[in-house]
Regions:
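ATP-dependent carboxylate-amine ligase catalytic core
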Residues: 118, 137-139, 143-158, 184-280, ...
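Glycine-rich phosphate-binding loop signature in dinucleotide/nucleotide-binding domains
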Residues: 256-262, 455-459, 529-541
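C-terminal helical cap/extension that packs against the catalytic core
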Residues: 325-335, 340, 360-363, 433-435, ...
Length: 563
């Protein structure tokens, strides 16, 4: 059985995950809801992507629900949606305000229901408007459009200090740990990560929660005319409209300024120098481990990738650099010298001094910039997460006290204890245990394999693997081969997903025909993997991996959509 602290299967929070893929499931004009609808999953964020409906229909379907269960069942489930809102006080997953209920005016609840419905419908329209733009897996290598939008908006990105993170693997977990630490310190935080699992609002969070619909709609309505102006200027000069990712970045920085936040913790989307997030200057720049990924866009060697990533290190900043291969380390060192940034290297300025697997995570000790931190509980699995935590601690020390002041012990322990990283070696079901992990490149798969060996014990572990066609599927499968007793290959909801037959052929060459099963549909593949895991009785498990999309798909299939 897995060495994992039992917890409520429905209690999953947080909104991010590791991996450098940036909303890899999207093509131009496509909503993530389109893909999930093919699985027959009709959640409020995914089903009926292109249907038109009036407000009453939307209230009935998305805000109030079908009346088949819940508090309304006890009151007769009025057929009229408004009446159901009045009698139950529940509007879908939104509780009508207690003030409205206490007032004795049932119409107030109905008005709130309609207002909530209108806001949610408008938010969905906004998402679809943004999705119609060039997708983020095909970025335009320029900062001109984002800079122009920022200028027109009064440069909101200058209204808050920023901790900026780049890397190949580990940057989302590190971003989440940094955010939790500074929030526990009492600062109001804005966090930007990508891609999202289930709702694009996950990308933009305030104090750890996705931006609320009311603020999203209001800020979008404020900035949309300026985005249209930039589009017009660019296309009039033979350029392109702002891309999906560029617009999301502008929206995020505007939301952070509107809040306002005390600090923004921002993960790059892709690369560094020409990533849209780089219109803001980080007072602390963090570089997590670099490896080969997105070679089409970033280059075929780690040196090429390092030259792109180093662009987030700005003059006078602190550069917190996780352990790198020597070639990468030298490139980053030269950048720090060139811009007069202070380089704080893992192994020199900070380090993991001890770690031991524990129930529900691990115990770690860290040498920080300002002192030692011993016997910290981290509820994440694997040595790579211990190093991510150490990097996050160093980044926060640099931000709060220039690396000269220790983080308060109570603050540190409370923050780490509350850290989550959905989609990263996450337990989403029991009997059999189902894990999801967003590993999508060989380095990520190797870290996953080591974390499994370190933290879990299965009598039989079955892989459920779906990867994108432009990824190094062979090396990913090879990295996992010693860990998996059997592998079920399939496709995920991305139109870029590799054909299962092609993936199965690769797997058979590495694993042997008797250890490989090909299933075309992911829901059927999940059922098959679970059955294979149960073949030898208790102690079996399923590992769903190969892509951010695969992790999100399996979470959705198993009803884990909280983010």
């Amino acid at each position: 059985m897995s060495d994992q602290r039992p917890r409520d299967e429905n209690d999953y929070d947080g909104d991010g995950f590791d991996g450098a893929d940036v909303n890899e499931h999207l093509v131009e004009g496509e909503s993530p809801r389109d893909g999930y609808a093919t699985f027959g999953i009709q959640g409020e964020s995914f089903g009926h992507a292109n249907e038109e409906m009036d407000l009453d229909e939307y209230v009935a379907e998305h805000v109030i629900g079908d009346g088949s269960a819940g508090p309304g069942a006890e009151t007769g489930d009025a057929a009229d949606p408004t009446e159901r809102a009045l009698t139950t006080g529940i509007v879908g997953d939104n509780i009508v305000s207690k003030k409205a209920q206490r007032s004795g005016d049932p119409r107030a609840a109905a008005r709130e229901a309609e207002e909530a419905a209108a806001l949610r419908l408008r938010a969905r329209e906004i998402e679809d408007e943004i999705l119609a733009r060039t997708p983020e897996n095909n970025p335009e290598p320029s900062l001109e459009r984002v800079r122009r939008a920022m200028e027109l908006l009064g440069d909101p990105q200058t209204s808050f200090p920023m901790i900026h993170l780049t890397g190949t693997n580990g940057k989302t977990s590190t971003t989440r740990i940094v955010e939790r630490l500074v929030r526990e310190r009492g600062l109001k935080t804005g966090r930007f990560t990508s891609p999202h699992l289930h709702d694009f609002r996950e990308r933009i969070s305030l104090d750890g929660e996705p931006v609320d619909v009311e603020r999203l709609v209001r800020v979008w309505d404020d900035i949309e005319p300026f985005i249209a102006m930039v589009d017009h200027e660019s296309t009039s000069n033979g350029g392109v409209r702002m891309t999906y990712f560029e617009v999301i970045v502008v929206l995020a920085y505007a939301v952070f300024a509107d809040a306002p936040v005390d600090v923004a913790i921002v993960e790059v989307g892709l690369g560094g120098a020409w990533d849209a997030t780089n219109v803001a200057d980080g007072v602390v720049s963090v570089v997590t481990p670099l490896a080969l990924d997105h070679q089409r866009l970033l280059g075929d060697t780690v040196e090429d990738i390092a030259h792109e990533k180093k662009g987030i290190i700005k003059p006078g900043a602190f550069a917190v650099v996780a352990a790198q291969v020597p070639e990468v380390d030298e490139i980053l060192r030269e950048q720090c010298l060139e811009v007069d940034a202070t380089m704080l290297r893992e192994g020199d300025a900070y380090a993991v001094t001890a770690r031991e697997a524990a129930v529900g995570g691990q115990m770690i000790s860290v040498k920080g910039l300002a002192g030692e931190y011993d016997d910290l509980f981290l509820p994440l699995f694997g040595a790579h997460q211990a190093h991510n935590a150490a990097t996050a601690i160093a980044a926060v020390e640099a931000f709060l006290g220039g690396g000269e002041t220790k983080i308060d012990d109570g603050v540190l322990r409370a923050a780490l204890d509350a850290v989550t990283s959905p989609g990263r070696l996450e337990v989403v079901r029991r009997s059999p245990t189902v894990l999801v992990d967003a590993a999508h490149n060989p380095a990520g798969a190797q870290a996953l394999r080591e974390a499994l060996a370190d933290s879990f014990q299965f009598n039989r572990l079955v892989g459920l693997v779906a990867v994108l066609a432009d990824k190094d599927a062979e090396e990913l499968l090879l990295a996992l081969e010693p860990t998996l007793d059997h592998v079920v290959v399939t496709r995920n909801t991305s139109p870029r997903s590799m054909d299962p037959r092609e993936l199965g052929q690769l797997a058979a060459e590495l694993y042997g025909d008797d250890r490989v099963t090909v299933v075309d549909s992911l829901p059927d593949a999940l059922d098959r993997a679970a059955a294979l895991a149960d073949d030898e009785g208790v102690g079996g498990g399923v590992l769903a991996t190969g892509s951010v999309v695969t992790a999100a798909d399996v979470r959705m299939l198993l009803g884990v959509t909280s983010s």
